[in-house]
Each structure stands twice: as C-alpha cells, then as structure tokens.
Amino acid sequence: MTQAVMLQGTASDVGKSVLVAGLCRIFYQDGLRTAPFKSQNMALNSGITPDGKEMGRAQIFQAEAAGIAPDVRMNPVLLKPTSDRKAQVVLMGKVATDMDAVSYHEYKPRLREQILTVYNSLAQEYDVLVLEGAGSPAEINLRDRDIVNMGMAEMAQCPVILVADIDRGGVFASIYGTLALLHDSERARVKGVIINKFRGDVTLLYSGIEQIEALTGVPVLGVMPWLEVDLEDEDGVALQKGKYLRTDKRDIDIAVVQVPHISNFTDFNALAAQPDVRVRYVRHPEELAGADLIILPGSKNTLGDLVWLRESAMAHGVLQAHRQGVPVAGICGGYQMLGDTIIDEVESGLGTLPGLGLLNTVTHFAQDKTTTQVEGQMASALPGWLAAASGLAVRGYEIHMGETTLNAQCQPAMTLRKGENAIADGAVTDDGLVFGTYLHGLFDSDAFTRALVNGLRVRKGLTPLDHAFHYAQYKSQQFDLLADAMRQHIDIEKIYTIMQQHREPV
C-alpha cells in the first residue's frame, strides 16, 4: 500500500520544492522507492524526460534526489507563461494550447480525472509519493476548481504538512491565517507545520511555537535553518529576489542577460558551481563591464525579449562589448536573438524582426515544438578561445519551436546524434567570439565546461586549471547535505508516523 505526504505552503517561494527534494532523498536513503508529484506547475524552467516529454525542472531535480529518472507523470500539467496574461499549457509533456488565466480556470475541472489516473499509476510503482502544492492552499478565490493544493490532497487522500517561511517575516500570522481560511475538512488534513529559512537562535522561537500549536492544534514538526545548499530553483522568483547576485571575486566573470521572459536559467548552475567562476544575472548595460563572457539565455518570448534588449539599451551594451573583444554566447532563444533575422508567425505576433546580427543566421518559428534529450560532440576544429573544446562530448536537451539556418562566416558549433542521424547544431563565427546553440544543459558536460572556462582563463593570461569538477557528483552531495540537515532539524519519524496512520488504498 503506497504511502504519501503532501507539502503545501503559506505562500509561494517558501521552500516547498527544496523540502520535497529533501524528503525524496531521505526516503531514498532509507531504501524506499520514492517519487515526487506536482499535479500542476507554473514555471519557465522545464526539462525533458528520456522519452522526449517536457516537465518542470523542480520535479526533475526532485526525481534526481530520489535516485530515479524523471517521468512526465510526476508533473502532468505544466504552465509556461508567455506574457502577463497568457501561458502555454503543456499536458503530459506535450503542448496542448495557449490560454489566458480565466479560460484556464474554467478548463481545470476537465483535468481532474486525468491527473488522478496519472497519480494512481505512479502509486502502483512506488512505496512513497511526495506531493507538492503550489502557492498557498488559502487562495479562496480559486478553491472551487483547485487541482494542485487541497483539491489534489483530497484526490490522493493524503495528509498535508504546511511549510512557512520565517525569513520574510510574519511567520505565525501566515500559519494561523492559512489554517483559518481552510474548510474544516481541509484543515483536518494538515498534520504538521515546518518553519523554514530560520536565521539565529532557535530558542527565541519556542514560546511562539507553543502558542501557535495551542491556537491551531497543529504541531510544529521542526524549524529548518537557512541552508547554503546549492540546489535548483523552480522559477524566476529567486532571480527577482537577487539570490543569484554574487559579490565574491572569482577569476572568471560571466554575465547572463536577465531578459524578462528568461527560461531555463538552471542551464548556468553548473557554470556557477565551478571554483573559479562567478555568474552574474544582469539587467542594465553598465553591468556588462568586466565580463569575460556574456550569455543570452533561453526565452519563452524571444521576440518580446529582443524588443526589450533594444529598448533597455542592453543590445547596444552587448554589441559594444563584442566590438571590444568580449565573447558572446546564446542558448536557445538567446541563440536565435544573436542572428540576423527572426521570422515569427507563431509565438508573439510581432512578425519579422532583425536580430543582433552577431551570427549570420535566420530563424523561422514553427508550430511544432522540438523536445528531446540528445548527445553529441563539439565541432572538430573550433576557432579562437573555444579551440580546447574541439571534439569534446556534450549532452543536454532541446526545447524550441524554431529552426535556424546558417549562412556565410559561421559554422556549426556541434553535431548531435538523433536516432541514426547526425545533425549539425548551433553556430560559431570564424573568430570564435560568438557562438550559439539550442542545447540546454550544455554546461552540465564537465569536460566541455572546464575547456570553455580554461579558454577564458588563457584569454586573461591565467593558467588553465586541471581541476576535475563532476557536476552530477556535486549535485548528489548537495542532496545529501539537505537530507542530513532535515534529519537534524525536522522530526522525520513523526512524518513516517503521519504517513502510516493516513495511508489509504489507491
């Protein structure tokens, strides 16, 4: 009989995703077959399963914490905002349609049966399912059609643990207010509270914990300290709050342009984990000063972000830096923006726009989205500072709705294996100062990333490092650190008891 527990939050960005990953790691360490589940995820950070399905990055890294391959059933509904009012709806890993918020709210009840079927199929295969809610269960205006918080807990018949963020202040009010706004049947599902992101002397909380337990009748299962573990973030909230704003000095400085619709900024986690690299996310042209490499990231609204580049003067800043000899790279949408022309009759309604003109390429948007995991190797004779990366193996995934054609003065950056075919991907200029690719996750390829960083070191007159950095091993260590901290600060045995007392046949 499958056991399950669901983490819901008093608000967005309280740390649910990380704590779910931690529980997945703990149960995995304890020998239980464990899988994460989030019925509906809204995020621009997505990834691709081994069978070519698109799902949220949060559930992918939670699956990694559980020691299993990601499966689209772990995130059957993915919403990818394309503007402030509309989102692309991805169902079971494939694009279904675009909807505005009102239309989607009306549509949600039709998804309940499919979500429950998917959940039950996972429950047949795993000992424990760790569910994650979205935002807060106290969104009373959305309650009647909820499929991700208490609505999902009811479908799964599972207990709920409420996560509250003390770092933002008002933690006891947020706990009390959330519980007060729940219906009696919903409140009865909440079996514990975790206070997250605490800094300071925990004894100062004890009297408050006693009072909130008396007021609500719900026990506090633990107080998690603020942790310096390096794990992925689900969406752009962390960027907006400056989590990735690093001030420490490193040998190599990489500036990632933070376009308004940035997607898959997790591409750069492996770069930031390098011992000699500082990755900065920048929004103003003056912040490009001192960069050894400028990267244009992926985007869910490529032409909209291209317009922003020009209106914000960031385009001028990138072009000026390039004229001064600073290398420029682009990933997916960023690669498209580096070209001469983008022809879009699908995504934005903006038609045809000139790109930055740093690559002699033309991109045509298409209706069909490419979603696949791929492996390949860099071109055999890369020019300039990229030479050390020539011929190296790379792997990653593609998520894009465009095809890019290369013209004169640039060559393919790599060759990717797709089934029996070898397909050229990306582009690099003859001098090597500009390159782009559709390959997300490129920097997770350890040898390539070290060669790229060493190329930047040589340009600065620094000695290359022989440091062998293994990003997959590093991530595994971070999961273990998280699990250790949770075992120390949370009553994990109580969580086991909660699951055992409330497990129900699927």
From Swiss-Prot:
Pathway assigned to this chain's UniProt record: Cofactor biosynthesis; adenosylcobalamin biosynthesis
Alphabetized PROSITE patterns for the sequence: GATASE_COBBQ
One GO BP annotation of this record: cobalamin biosynthetic process
Molecular function (Gene Ontology), one example: ABC-type vitamin B12 transporter activity
Classification via SUPFAM superfamilies: Class I glutamine amidotransferase-like, P-loop containing nucleoside triphosphate hydrolases
Pfam families associated with the record: CbiA, GATase_3
GATase cobBQ-type domain: residues covered: 251-448
Keywords in alphabetical order: Cobalamin biosynthesis, Glutamine amidotransferase
Family: Belongs to the CobB/CobQ family. CobQ subfamily.
Role, per record: Catalyzes amidations at positions B, D, E, and G on adenosylcobyrinic A,C-diamide. NH(2) groups are provided by glutamine, and one molecule of ATP is hydrogenolyzed for each amidation.
Protein name (database record): Cobyric acid synthase
